[in-house]
């Protein structure tokens, strides 16, 4: 852990978790739509 810029570290972590959340929502939407249309 570097104490020079901890704010940038948390911003990177938030961005990564945001991308994972969007990916999860996208996958769930695809599965749900395929379940509905079949």
Curated annotation (Swiss-Prot):
Subunit: PSII is composed of 1 copy each of membrane proteins PsbA, PsbB, PsbC, PsbD, PsbE, PsbF, PsbH, PsbI, PsbJ, PsbK, PsbL, PsbM, PsbT, PsbY, PsbZ, Psb30/Ycf12, at least 3 peripheral proteins of the oxygen-evolving complex and a large number of cofactors. It forms dimeric complexes.
Family under the similarity heading: Belongs to the PsbL family.
Source organism (scientific name): Bigelowiella natans
Highest taxon in the source lineage: Eukaryota
Protein name: Photosystem II reaction center protein L
Keyword Protein transport: no
Any one of the GO BP annotations: photosynthesis
InterPro entries xref list: PSII_PsbL, PSII_PsbL_sf
Disulphide bonds in the chain: none
Membrane-related topology note: Single-pass membrane protein
Transmembrane segments: 17-37
Matching HAMAP family: PSII_PsbL
GO CC annotation, single: chloroplast thylakoid membrane
Keyword Chloroplast tagged: yes
Phylogenetic lineage: Eukaryota, Sar, Rhizaria, Cercozoa, Chlorarachniophyceae
Intracellular or extracellular location(s): Plastid, Chloroplast thylakoid membrane
Keywords attached to this entry: Chloroplast, Membrane, Photosynthesis, Photosystem II, Plastid, Reaction center, Thylakoid, Transmembrane, Transmembrane helix
Principal location class: plastid
GN (gene name): psbL
Function of the protein: One of the components of the core complex of photosystem II (PSII). PSII is a light-driven water:plastoquinone oxidoreductase that uses light energy to abstract electrons from H(2)O, generating O(2) and a proton gradient subsequently used for ATP formation. It consists of a core antenna complex that captures photons, and an electron transfer chain that converts photonic excitation into a charge separation. This subunit is found at the monomer-monomer interface and is required for correct PSII assembly and/or dimerization.
């Amino acid at each position: 852990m570097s104490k020079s810029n901890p704010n940038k570290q948390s911003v990177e972590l938030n961005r990564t978790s945001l991308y994972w959340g969007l990916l999860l929502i996208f996958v769930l939407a695809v599965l749900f739509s395929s379940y509905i249309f079949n």
